[in-house]
Regions:
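Amphipathic alpha-helical core segments of compact helical bundles
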Residues: 28, 246, 341, 362-370, ...
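Structural motif
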Residues: 13, 325, 348-357, 397-398, ...
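Strongly charged, low-complexity linkers/loops
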Residues: 377-387, 397-471
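Core structural elements
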Residues: 203-216, 321-344, 354-372, 390, ...
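Basic, nucleic-acid-interacting segments
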Residues: 2-311, 322, 328, 349-353, ...
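Short, basic interhelical loop/turn and adjoining N-cap
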Residues: 473-479
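Extended, non-catalytic structural segments that build the interaction scaffolds
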Residues: 301-308, 315, 345-350, 386-398
Length: 492
């Protein structure tokens, strides 16, 4: 949790934040962007390198076609205009894990521009503009700790050098840490649906830098911005922005000036710290990459890529609401991942009542998966099993209590619901009126005090009686029928 500076509520109300995000997404190609080396994560250090990765003299880059297609697909998914011609450029700076002394990126002629993402804000929505999406290569990785002989050494792993990235730069349209969180959540969903990246933040497949400034409410001019780096989760991004906004307001309120700089976020302390002065574009001395021709993505190639653009989360939500009659809230939860949405639709198509399937997937199934740390693909209960269980409860064959117990057994035994249902002797909810009346008479006789309370007007006591009947029937009594019979007996 961010440790916010002591800024008064009135001061916070007088200022508004202006936020823009730069998101780097690692593309899920088998080989690097300018050579054939593997992009596999977790291999031994410096095992996936070649003269191109190492920046050796005479090594020439060859552009990976699949990386271009993935980048175009992502750009289309966030509503960008694809530039038919874009140019690679050298971004010059020194860092130990950048062996060439420059990074091949794109500058004034990027692959795509002028996109947008729609996010929920309050009871409505808001469009966040996308300035640009461009292709570039990743740098290597500096490892600063874990050396037994000295803590002052840094090791360099160049396996990541040359891995293909797209950088997605938003317009400064984001007005709060909450909006930043929603933007990143929606962007991650969209990228996952396209399949161009696994957006795994722990492995560095998605990285985010935040540019933030504050200004008096109503002012058009931007304030001086800072860039916050080293933020490796969406929650930390929100916390870092909350702290930095409060810090900047405090500086301005006390008569100081904001320094344009790069700051690091320390999640343990919940604070940002100055790292270095913020570079401007001219500091990188961009110039066109002489070893690569301009990238041409003509209309025919764009149309080929557009054909493989999948149904995206927002469109899928709208279709599922219309097709299955589920609520917008259900649709939102069920489309958070493409895999979950696919699984739900498979079950919904096989069941009589898709709404019941939605409730079971979100409640009984996802709750147990989360408790055991499992993904939907690891569920012992298949979507056919969910559909089967939904139909059993829909028909009244089993009660919700029986369903919960059978789901528990499925997870304990690692078996699908139909198999466990068979093993348990295909239990049925009891709707035998005469048998239930005998149990009800027994329960009322044993609890005369509660019966008098009911007759005196305390109608909620009926829940106690239902529980007792369900207990004696070992959960197999039809609770709706039990309610009816109890009310009739107690009212007589």
């Amino acid at each position: 949790m961010a440790t916010t500076p002591d800024t008064s509520v009135s001061a916070l109300a007088r200022y508004e934040p202006v936020i823009g995000l730069e998101v780097h997404v690692q593309l899920l190609t088998a080989s690097k962007i300018f050579c054939s080396c593997s992009t596999r994560f977790g291999d031994p250090p410096n095992s996936n390198v070649c003269p191109v990765c190492l920046g050796l003299p005479g090594a020439l880059p060859v552009l990976n076609r699949k990386a271009v297609e993935f980048a175009v697909l992502a750009a289309m998914a966030i509503n960008c205009r694809i530039n038919q011609t874009s140019i690679f450029a050298r971004k010059n700076y020194f860092y130990p894990d950048l062996p060439k002394g420059y990074q091949i990126s794109q500058y004034d002629k990027p692959l795509a521009e002028h996109g947008w993402i729609q996010i929920p804000v309050g009871s409505g929505t808001k469009k966040i503009g996308i300035t640009r999406l461009h292709l570039e290569e990743d740098a290597g990785k500096s490892l600063h700790e874990g050396f037994p002989d000295s803590q002052e050494k840094t090791a360099i792993d160049l396996n990541r050098s040359g891995v293909p990235l797209i950088e997605i730069v938003s317009e400064p349209d984001i007005a709060s840490p909450e909006e930043a969180y929603e933007y990143l959540t929606r962007l991650k969903e969209i990228i996952l649906y396209t399949g161009v990246s696994d957006v795994n933040m722990e492995e560095g497949s998605l990285r985010c830098d935040a540019n933030v400034s504050v200004r008096p409410r109503g002012q058009k001019e931007f304030g001086t911005k800072t860039e916050v780096k080293n933020v490796n989760s969406f929650r930390f991004i929100r916390e870092a922005l909350e702290y930095e906004i409060d810090r900047q307001i405090g500086v301005v309120e006390s008569g100081g000036k904001i320094t344009q700089e790069t700051r690091l976020y320390n999640p343990n302390e919940g604070k940002t710290y100055g790292m270095r002065s913020k570079e401007e574009a001219h500091d990188y001395r961009y110039f066109p990459e002489p070893d690569l021709l301009p990238l041409v993505v003509d209309e025919n190639w764009q149309q080929e890529i557009r054909k493989i653009l999948p149904e995206l989360p927002e469109a899928r939500r709208e279709r599922m609401i219309a097709e299955y009659g589920i609520t917008p809230q259900d649709a939102q939860v069920l489309t958070t991942s493409k895999s979950l949405a696919d699984q739900f639709e498979a079950a919904a198509k096989a069941a009589k009542n898709p709404k019941r399937v939605a409730n079971l997937v979100q409640g009984e199934l996802m709750g147990r998966l989360k408790a055991k740390g499992l993904e939907i693909e690891q569920s012992p209960i298949s979507m056919k099993g969910v559909a089967f269980s939904a139909d059993l409860t829909e028909s009244g064959a089993i009660s919700s209590k029986m369903l919960k117990d059978l789901y528990d057994l499925s997870f304990e035994r690692g078996k699908d619901f139909p198999a466990v249902y068979d093993e348990e002797g295909r239990p049925q909810q009891s709707s035998d009126t005469s048998a239930l009346e005998k149990i009800i008479d027994q329960v009322i006789a044993a609890n005369s005090k509660e019966a008098e309370q009911y007759r005196a007007g305390k109608k909620t006591v009926i829940g106690f009686f239902v529980g007792q009947v369900m207990k004696l029937s070992k959960g197999q009594a039809n609770p709706q029928l039990v309610n009816q019979l109890l009310a009739k007996k107690l009212d007589s």
